[in-house]
Each structure stands twice: as structure tokens, then as C-alpha cells.
Amino acid sequence: MAKVRVHELAKELGITSKDAVTKLQELGEFVRSASSTIEAPVVRKLRNAFPDAANKAAAPAAPKAPAPAAESRPAAPAPGPAAPKAPAPKVEAPAPAAPAASAPAAPQASSAAPAAPSTGAKPGARPGPKAETPAPAPRQGGSSQGSSAPRPGGPRPGNNPFATSQGMPRGRGGDGDRAPRPGNNPFATSQGMPRPGRSDGERPGGPRPAAGAGGPRPGGPRPAPGAGGPRPAAGAGGPRPGAPRPGGPRPTPGMMPNRTERPAPAGAGRPGGGGRGPGRPGAPGTGGPGGGGGAPAGGGFGKGGRGRGGTQGAFGKGGAGRGKQRKSKRAKRQELEQMSAPSLGGVSVPRGDGNTVIRLRRGSSITDFADKIEANPAALVTVLFHLGEMATATQSLDEDTFALLGEELGYKLQVVSPEDEERELLSTFDIDVEAELEAEGDEELEPRAPVVTVMGHVDHGKTRLLDAIRNSDVVAGEHGGITQHIGAYQISHEHEGVERDITFIDTPGHEAFTAMRARGAKVTDIAILVVAADDGVMPQTVEALNHAQAANVPIVVAVNKIDKEGANPDKVKGQLTEYGLVPEEYGGDTMFVEVSARQNLNINELIDAVLLTADAALDLRANPDKAARGIAIEANLDKGRGAVATVLVQSGTLAVGDTIVAGTAHGRVRAMFDEDGQALDVALPSRPVQVLGLSNVPRAGDTFLVTSDERTARQIAEKREAADRNAQLAKRRKRISLEDFDQAVADGKIDTLNLILKGDVSGAVEALEDALLKIDVGEGVQLRVIHRGVGAITQNDVNLATVDSAVIIGFNVKPAERVADLADREGVDMRFYSVIYAAIDDIEAALKGMLKPEYEEFQLGTAEVREVFRSSKFGNIAGSIVRSGIIRRNTKARISRDGKIIGDNLTIETLKRFKDDATEVRTDFECGIGLGSYNDITEGDIIETFEMREKPRV
């Protein structure tokens, strides 16, 4: 199926394009305007959203009941005796008469009908069945003179070619004189001269016979008066036989193909139909009150329901009865709002009442805000400019800027939190994780292993404790003995005679990895807080404790390094009591276990304490019989296997071949491995596994879920990526106020250090970025991370650094082949680090080096004026004695008298020792000092010399 545009589909469904675009956006589709193209699945979604409109569009047009019967009728009725009068009861017949009720009217045609030539549809007419118009019944109440006189041909007076009554009126048997011609108004309901012979202005004539049915006549030309069928003379008692007009029939609007109108009930018609005479009541089956016999429902030659003057008019304008098109209520309301809206900065914008709540996503732009309040984005840019902020209409803004704009305009702006944004995103795909958990019954839940996080200060022995638990050696693989990323393992332990599984997550303790440690607290069931017995509570210990308490996670304290000299476990217990962790022996509920990871002491007791806490305080159950849900613990880019993510399954079962989406990455699970590298087919709840097959590297802490198809996973990942990109742009936006803008332009462009970060795992790269962005060395230098990624440094990274003059920072990675040579040729600076301390120190030093130097005044010496010598060549010369320091030539000087500065920013232009020029004069020596053109020198003045020196940065 070819792609269709939104407005085409909206027209097909019978809805407005705006409603279609709004519904598609509510369904989670990215549609910019009504001209956007959408694919077949999206078309089906929109059709399902409007089932009534879709059924109406799919159904054919309502068939016109009389059409098949009319097609089989002869062109003219059979000759018969003329009916002098139409049956009177039919005038009073109700409008919604059945089609069969009008059938007897057909034999009442004029006897002169056979003499009329058969007039069929012209070649240009729209094909369709058409019942020929029979001869009209004789009119009542008129004179009988001239009953069989044919209507003469020739040109007809009047210049309205579309009028239903043309030319001069014919005499009506002398019933009255001709009335004056009313004029030539193409929009009048009665065109041309009125017909004489009606003293009261009305025709009491009976109804015209219908064309065999009361419903609307199918398309086709109607015979023009006097051109086709017979037309009775005015006032005649019988029908007047018509004759063909010389030279062919005159074209009338009735000969034009009728436009398809909405079908009307048979015999109903519409009020105001254009009939042959003004105010003549229509018979059942005709066009309704005033309708012409056999015309479409509503009568007349024009569109149905337009009345006598309902044609397009002489100049192609709208027909009579419509008049000037009125504005809709919405247009009037908008105009009134624009007129009454207060003006700010020369523009008018709609304002709220102070309580109007507007919800925006993170990283929204002024255009998004303008769409919410139906305002012009350019006007909001002007308002923001007058508020002292500079931004473009499509630039992502932070929450503070939106709060400033909303407060000025009377709106309460609410920025959607990441959790709500994620929930709304998944709801567009009919995914509700919280509802799934609430709907699960007890019979569906099965016990699962507890997830334990090891937290604590750096170098307090967390990883070595896990080594003792796993009987492995992980510390040797960490740079500097510091854990750089999260590791997840699962062990089996016999507890009370039962084999129990426990999942451990090791989180780094370095202060730069706060975000990673916080993620570890979000996914865990129990936290083991490791505290060294010799060091006690440290800053990162308190931070880890706060993370665990904020996540409402039970805590088991492991007092490590009890085998070292100076260990004092009681001191640790006393310190932790201040933070709400009271040991059981002190009457609290927190379990403390004294262990030694190096000596392998009390390791089993620690595991038993964890299991006891889990059984006593937690209900660890999950439903394995559903699609998997979980969290990405860590991710990296492997050279041979591609993107590898370590995920923790929290509920459901993850199997090979499932389609998953993790953050901004999506794909199909190609393979799964455990912590020992063994391949797995399925992963049950609380099981950490390595997953292969993702499109890119997800971030540590991103949630993952299994979707029904790959298309859904791709759309979720793309929308997450767009939201994250906008949020990052808003967060990194440099706010420049109008007060600082002129100064920034005068001083030059603000210096920016561009960085490209590459690392071995995504969590380490993100932690490094957060640590670098916290460096603050002043307002004149800005740090900007233009790209970050996982894996080796590639040529694309070097090319990007060349364009943006960036520095590449490699964290536990090296450049790929021939990349180092390319970087040397392009002059790109690449730095490689394995410990985060060195990276932070070097970047901070580089930022300080980019700052403009700051100078401070340094005093050199002072001299007292003893005598003033006047010289015509050099001006006044101060004969002085140096009281302190050194007096140098060409240095800055100032003169003070009685403690007040009388001359500043002077220069010592001449300095002499007796008659010889001197470069400098030291303390207690006499000299002559010349200050150039400055001559206000007297005895007793103090000359102070100084120089500006660059201030060293701390």
C-alpha cells in the first residue's frame, strides 16, 4: 500500500486534518503537519480510532430509489386524454409521500406531449438514468385564450443567462397590464419581468405531475422551457403544445450536469426550492414548497435547497440566499482574544488566569509551548527577549526559563518528570508496567532470589569482599584498585539446609560514580554497607547510606578489616548510630557482621544475615510467566560481539529470540551468557545475564522490556532518544542575559573547551561526564561534551574533533588502527586515562589555562619629595629620597599628599642619580624623578610606584 497523506485520509474519514494530526500524536506517531505521509500500519491505527467515520467512508453513497425505475421508463408518456385539472387532494398530501404514491400522476400528462421531440441527455451531461419530464398539467384559474399558440423563438430580452425565467413575459389573456420590470439583480429570488394575469400576485394552480417518483431526480439535463417539452400558455385551461426553438434550444443552467447532492427523502424536498413561479406549493414527489416538478430535492435548476435565485449568479459568485459568508464563532472568539490580549514588547499573546496549567516535556522549545496556548512562536520569542533571555523558537529551554515565561504570561508550567514521561510514552503503545504488577495474583507469583548491592567508601574492601564470596579475584583487574563499573554475579549458598541463590551487584565507591551507585540502590532488595574498621565512617559511606535509605532498602552492615591493627568495630557502630543504623545489641534492628575479606572471616555469617533480612523484611516474589522486564546494569561495546549489555531480569522470563528495547537501544536477543561466560537460553527473575544483539549501547540504569514486535521496539527507542537529546540540549544551554550580552560581545567570544569522551563501559563514561561538568573555574570558560560513546576511538571521532577543535579523552580505551596517525596529522589532542582522578585534574588545569589572566597591583617602592626642580625641557623634577623598596624607570606611579591621592596612573619617564640616568634606585638613596607632563608636585608629597602582575589561580 502506497503512503498516504494525513489530509487525504482525514477527508476520506470525514474529519478535519487538525483532528487527524492530534489523534496521530496521541497515538504516539511523529506527524508534523497535515501534509505528512503515513504508512499502512499507521493508517489502520487511525481508522480504528475513528470507526464510525471509517464505516461511513467505506459505505457507498445512498442509492436513489427512483433511479432504476426511471431508467426503464419510455422517454415520454403514452398519449392520453388531457387532464384539465390535477386532483385536489394531492395538493394537501403530506410531504413524505411514498414513491409509489406519485406514480398515478404520470398518465395525467398533456395530450400534446407526443408532438414534442424527445429530448435526451446531451453528450456533455453526466451519465445516469433520468426520467423524462412529462408535459406539465394545465394551470388553474387562468384565461383560456391562446391555449395552443406555440411559443415563438428568437432572442429573448434580458441579460442574465442563468436566470430560470428569461425574456419579456407573455400576455395572460388580458387579466391586467404589464408590471414594470423590477430590475436586473442576479441574486433576486425572482428573475426577469413578472408574469401578468395574476391580480393577487399568487398562482392558485394545482400541483404539477411528478416524473414518477417523489425522490430527487438523478443527474442529467432538464429540458429548457420552450425548447423541449410542451409548455402551457399563461392562463390557459389546457396545456400549450411546445415547439422546438429555431436554431436549437437555448442553453440554460438546467442543461448543465447536476452536482451530486445529499439524497433527500422522497417527496420531502427543501424549503425555498426554485420553482417555476414564486410561492407555488409543490406537489408530493416534487421539489417541495415552490419546487419545480421533477427537479432534484429542493427544486430549481441549481443546487438543491438554494431557491429560485440559487444559481451561481451572473458573475460566478455564490447564489442568492447565502449572502456574505459569516465568520464562525471560533474565528470571532480568536479575533476578540487577540484584540483584548495585553501587549508585551509590541506583540499580543494569549494570557492565562494564573491557574492555567501547561504540561511540557523535558527539553521542550518555544514552539511546543506556543502550540499549547495557540500562540505565535515568534511572539513568544519577543516576549522572552524583553524578559532578558535570548532563545530561538526551536531551541530547547530549561525549566527555569519556562517558569519565567509562564509566570509573565499567567500560566503554571509543569515539566513532566522522566518517570511520567516514560509512563506516557509506554502508554501510547498500550504498555502499562504498573498495571501489570497490580493485576498479578498470588497464584502467579513465585519466589525469587534477593538482589544485594555492596556499597561503601572507596578502598574499604567491597570488591575483595565479593571476591571472598565468589572465591574469585576481581580486584586485580581494576585500575588502581578502584572499581570502575558495576559487576553483577549470582551465587548459591546453603542456608538452613536449603540451596538459595543470591544476586550481588558491586558498585564503585569513588565520589565520581555517585550516579552509578544510585542506580545500584534502585534495583536492589538489600544493601550491604561495607565500613573499614580502621577508617570508620567516611564521606562516601554517608552518601551510600543516604542512597539506600532514600530507596527504602534494608541495610546489613559489614565491618571489614577487623584483622588490621587499629581496627575498632565499636567505633564504627557508634558512628553509624548517628545515622539511624542501631545495632541489634544496642536495641536496634540493624544487623552488624564483623568480617575480614582478606582472611575470609565470617563470610558465611554475612550471607546468612542477608538471607535472614530478606526473609524477615521482604516478600521476594515475581511472575516468571510473562514478557521480561528489568534494568540494564552495565553495557559496553565489544570489538567482536558488538553491543553487550548486562541486564538484570526483575520479572518475567527473558529468552533468546525475544525483541527487547533498553533505553535508546533495541534489537533481538541473539545470545545470553552468565557471569562465567556460559550460554543461556532463558533467564528467570533476579538473574543477571549478558545480552547480545542490541543496536547500540544502552546506558547503565536504563529499563528494558520485551515487546511484541521489532517495529514497536524501534519506535520506543527513537522516541526515548529524541526526548533525551532535547533534555540534554536544555541542560547544556548557556543562558546569556541581556546584561551580559553586550559585555560578552565587547570582550570577545566566551571560550569553550570541547570534549569527546570515549570509554570501555557506558556507566564509566557517564560518571566521568558528570564529574567534568561539575568543574567550575569561572564564567569565562565553558565546558562542553559534544560526543560521548563506548568503544575504541575511531576516525569519525578524530574528524569530529577536527571540525569542533575538541580534545579526545579516552577512558580505558585506545585508538583504533591508523587513528593515532590521523590525529597527529590533524593536530587533534588525545589523552588516555585509566583512573578518573588524573582525568579530572588535567581537564581542570586546562580550563584554568583558558581563562583570561587576572592582574593585581604589586607595590615596588615609595619615595618622599624633598625639593622640586623646575626645568624648561623636562618640566618639574622631584628631588626625592627612596623610603622603601625600589624606584624603577617606566613603572606606574601615583602621588599622594596628606594621605590623599592627587595623581594616579602616572609613569616615571625620567630617573636620574645625580646627573646620570638610572634604571632603578634602592632604599635610602636620593634621585630625581620626572613624571612627564604632570607638574603638580610639592615638597612632602609621596611618590608610590607599582606594577600589575598576573594573579596565580588557586
From Swiss-Prot:
Which interval of the chain is the signal sequence?
A: none
Where the record annotates domain tr-type G, the positions are: 447-618
Under the heading CDD domains, the entry gives: IF2_eIF5B, IF2_mtIF2_II, mtIF2_IVc
| Annotated binding of GTP, by residue | 456-463, 506-510, 560-563
Task: Using the UniProt annotation, give all residue ranges assigned to the region (G3).
Answer: 506-509
Keyword annotations for this protein?
Answer: Cytoplasm, GTP-binding, Initiation factor, Nucleotide-binding, Protein biosynthesis
Its main localization is cytoplasm
Feature: compositional bias, Basic residues: 323-332
Q: Where are stretches of biased composition, namely Gly residues?
A: 269-322
Record localization: Cytoplasm
**G2: region residues:** 481-485
Region entry G4, spans: 560-563
Where is the sequence biased in composition, kind Low complexity?
A: 56-75, 88-125, 138-151
MF terms in GO: GTP binding; GTPase activity; translation initiation factor activity
Q: Could you tell me which residues belong to the region G1?
A: 456-463
State if GTP-binding is listed as a keyword.
yes
Domain of life, per lineage: Bacteria
Q: Where is this region: Disordered?
A: 56-355
Q: Where is the composition biased (Pro residues)?
A: 76-87, 241-254
Extract the PROSITE patterns matched here. Answer: G_TR_2, IF2
* Family membership noted in the UniProt record: Belongs to the TRAFAC class translation factor GTPase superfamily. Classic translation factor GTPase family. IF-2 subfamily.
Please describe what this protein does.
One of the essential components for the initiation of protein synthesis. Protects formylmethionyl-tRNA from spontaneous hydrolysis and promotes its binding to the 30S ribosomal subunits. Also involved in the hydrolysis of GTP during the formation of the 70S ribosomal complex.
Instruction: State what protein this is by name.
Output: Translation initiation factor IF-2
Origin species: Pseudarthrobacter chlorophenolicus (strain ATCC 700700 / DSM 12829 / CIP 107037 / JCM 12360 / KCTC 9906 / NCIMB 13794 / A6)
